[in-house]
Amino acid sequence: MESELEALAPRPASPAEPPFQALVEAAGGRGQVLLVGELWEREQSRALLRDFAGAVFPPESAPGKPGCAEAESAGTAAATESHGAPGAKAERAIRSPLVFVLCRVGSLTSRESRRRLREMLRDVRDRRCEGAALVGVLVADTGADDARAPELQLLETLLRTVFGRQVGGPVQAAAFRPGCPASSLAVQEAACRALQAAGPGRPEGAWERPARTGLLTCFSWGPRRQRKNRGVTSSQGPAQEHLQFSEEELALTPVFPNGDCEDRGNGSRAQDGGVHIPPDPPEDTR
């Protein structure tokens, strides 16, 4: 009898995961979360976003929920509405209540790579809506030591130069190592702190949950190249080596949850990355 009662007794849950899930749900659900990652090599960039999403937002199955295809269709429609092609400021606005910005350790090792990362963060800052939480994530190599304190401090310093006094509040930093569950919990805890700090300043009704979607929207970030003639934007790549980066013209490349990325400016399509997550169960701002 005692053993039966013990079996029926509620078991303590993980200390980090339930608050994280509850806060994400309160902010609109995982379908409202945005991942931003560097674009250096297409498949590797995709794999990084996919691995991170799978570790921090583990798949959960629930009976009676919409299937993958149905959820993917709903998620694509929501992403298309909210994250249209780069253009006017309103069209480029990031309306997600929780944003993860992923960077590799190698992006902090040289002045040029830090400059690129700073430009990415500034672009996200300028597009991010008031009251949103943001977590800068340092991605360590698989098999690396858990301790990445020097690099994490560099990331925090970089975040502080861009977001100012928001760092430590709605802007947090964490280290993530693929294959290390403890690092996934650290990222979740950082997201909890950011969401809790952003909560009081969040405009009422700012976030609306898309219907029946369990998809995360992802961006692979790459600066737009521009001709010396500011009226023309080039997409030729290697043939335009004389072009310079213009901070005012930087833009996030939208990647929809089904993996399709459409640049409405030139009609081309690319597969820069996308992550499918199954549905949930019942300065001085500078």
From Swiss-Prot:
Tree of life domain: Eukaryota
InterPro entries: C2orf72-like_C (IPR027868)
Organism: Mus musculus (Mouse)
Protein name: Uncharacterized protein C2orf72 homolog
A Pfam family this chain is assigned to: DUF4630
Organism lineage: Eukaryota, Metazoa, Chordata, Craniata, Vertebrata
Residues in coiled coil: none
Biased composition (Low complexity): 69-85
UniProt region (Disordered), positions on chain: 59-89, 225-286
